[in-house]
Amino acid sequence: MNHKTFQILLVAYMILILGLSSMPAQDFPKTWLLTWDKLIHLVEYFILGILAMKSMNTISYRTLRIVLPFGMLFGVLDEYLQSFISGRFSSGWDVLADMIGVTIGALLILGNDKE
């Protein structure tokens, strides 16, 4: 796939993240999986990091310096918006898990591209 396709996937995925984050807490099914909240954040943003890196024209350390702040700001925006949703709250720990996920995903793509 070319970077334009990944740009479309990235935007669609970001909309999906914001859509899920906008759901009131009582709308989520009660499952054991939701107790793994930080792991879910990490995986969610790991995918975001991969899509963000692949959506760029070139993959380089310079690209990484764009993707990482982008991922962090998107995580902060996501948490901020959650603070307005019934039964949801913002968490710095969630932002940290988001940033770790973006970093791992982006570094994975950078490492694979450099080989």
Where does each model-flagged region fall?
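Membrane interface segments of multi-pass transport proteins and intramembrane proteases
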Residues: L33-L34, S60-Y61, D113
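Short helix-capping/hinge motifs at transmembrane helix termini and TM-loop junctions
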Residues: M23-P24, N57, S86, D113
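Interfacial helix-loop-helix junctions of multi-pass membrane proteins
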Residues: W32-W36, L77-M99
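Small-polar-interrupted transmembrane alpha-helices in polytopic inner-membrane proteins
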Residues: L10-S21, I66-S83, M99
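Membrane-interfacial alpha-helical segments at the cytosolic side of multi-pass membrane proteins
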Residues: E44-T58, V102-D113
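Membrane-helix interface segments
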Residues: N2-I8, I59-I66, R88-G92
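"…centered on the first transmembrane helix and the immediately adjacent amphipathic helix/loop
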Residues: M1-K54, V67
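Terminal transmembrane helix and immediately flanking juxtamembrane interfaces
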Residues: M1-S21, W93, A97-E115
